């Protein structure tokens, strides 16, 4: 078994002083733009600090020298899709509830991709901005767990597989495979054989797990016309994919959407094309939300307590910050609530 790699070490003022050949007080004066050192020394100190990758500590800027702990959360998703995603709104609500009770801050940032997310972690680490992070949207071949372990940042992975991505990280997960199997069971019992899953972003661990489960359930039942199509989670792509499917030679009799926003857009697109829900096509949304009960027909949906999901993740991170061990915590399987948007298949098999 390979030896555990020591966390990367942040450069300090002592390192700068040693490299520049000056005292630590001179380094402090130079970096804080205070009088007491010559311009030549100030320039040399700043040059060395840049070479070493030094960044000022947020806590060091505060009068007391000891700031409250801060938790970081970076989301690499399209900003327009994220703004209407009820899952993240509820998840963050649960996270913030726990952090507020502990007087902890939340530093939140939206980025365009996982490379940018990794760059944020490196910057936060170098600047002492966060004491731990919550990692969302686990990915296939995910570079983030290894990076966070290298940096020595405590982390909790939200979602993903039951196996922790790294020994020092906690994982909070739900059984997406079991939830997908339950949806297929329900639709199959209603007579549906042409089922299409309008999935989220490709490469996300939960997206791939849902796709694999759907494929396995279809093979088990001998259903060749069951498939998944990936999207960016937006209403625009949800509607566009729905139109393309329903305008095809053999439209599906049931659609499973990976979030509520795409499901709503899909129902609207179906209506525009003259497909009634659930008469001509049944619809299931992966995430239940109040939106699912604000339209006619009310949407059948997979329901879970997403706020509690966020609370659990935040509690696990605070436990790590308190010196507790890494754990794997399973939350309840999302439960299918059958409403008005699913019904018996009326299309020819």
Give the ranges of each region predicted by the language model.
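N-terminal helix-turn-helix DNA-binding module of bacterial transcription factors
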Residues: 1-69, 346-349
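Flexible loop/turn connectors
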Residues: 6, 226, 244, 248-349
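Short acidic/polar active-site loop segments enriched in Thr and Asp
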Residues: 23, 69, 131, 193-194, ...
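Amphipathic helical "hinge" segments at domain boundaries
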Residues: 54-120
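Hinge/beta->alpha junction and helix N-cap segments in small-molecule ligand-binding domains
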Residues: 78-90, 108-117, 172-182, 198-241, ...
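Short, well-structured alpha-helical segments in soluble
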Residues: 117-129, 239-249
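Flexible loop/hinge segments that line or gate small-molecule binding clefts
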Residues: 136-178, 261, 287-299
């Amino acid at each position: 078994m390979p030896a555990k790699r020591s966390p990367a070490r942040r450069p300090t003022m002592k390192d700068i002083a040693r490299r520049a050949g000056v005292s630590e007080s001179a380094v402090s004066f130079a970096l804080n733009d205070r009088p007491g050192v010559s311009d030549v020394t100030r320039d040399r100190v700043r040059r060395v600090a840049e070479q070493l990758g030094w960044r000022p500590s947020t806590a060091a800027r505060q009068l007391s020298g000891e700031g409250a702990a801060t938790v970081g959360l970076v989301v690499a998703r399209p900003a327009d899709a994220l703004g209407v995603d009820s899952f993240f709104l509820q998840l963050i609500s649960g996270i913030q509830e726990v952090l507020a009770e502990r007087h902890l801050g939340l530093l939140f940032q939206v980025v365009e991709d996982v490379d940018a997310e990794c760059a944020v972690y490196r910057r936060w680490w170098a600047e002492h901005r966060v004491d731990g992070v919550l990692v969302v949207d686990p990915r296939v071949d995910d570079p983030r767990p290894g990076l966070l372990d290298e940096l020595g940042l405590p982390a909790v992975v939200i979602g993903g597989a039951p196996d922790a991505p790294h020994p020092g990280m906690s994982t909070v997960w739900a059984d997406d495979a079991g939830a997908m199997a339950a949806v297929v069971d329900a639709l199959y019992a209603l007579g549906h054989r042409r089922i299409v899953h309008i999935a989220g972003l490709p490469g996300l661990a939960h997206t791939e797990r849902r796709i694999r489960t759907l494929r396995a359930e279809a093979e088990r039942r001998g259903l060749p016309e069951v498939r998944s199509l990936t999207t960016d989670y937006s209403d625009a792509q949800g509607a566009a994919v729905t139109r393309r499917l329903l305008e095809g030679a053999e439209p599906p009799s049931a659609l499973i959407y990976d979030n509520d926003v795409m499901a709503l857009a899909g129902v609207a697109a179906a209506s525009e094309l003259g497909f009634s829900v659930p008469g001509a096509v049944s619809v299931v949304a992966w995430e239940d939300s109040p939106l699912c009960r604000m339209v006619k027909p009310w949407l059948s949906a997979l329901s879970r307590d997403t706020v509690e999901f966020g609370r659990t993740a935040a509690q696990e991170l605070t436990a790590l910050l308190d010196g507790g061990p890494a754990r794997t915590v399973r939350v309840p399987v999302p439960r299918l609530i059958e409403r008005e948007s699913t019904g018996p298949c009326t299309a020819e098999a």
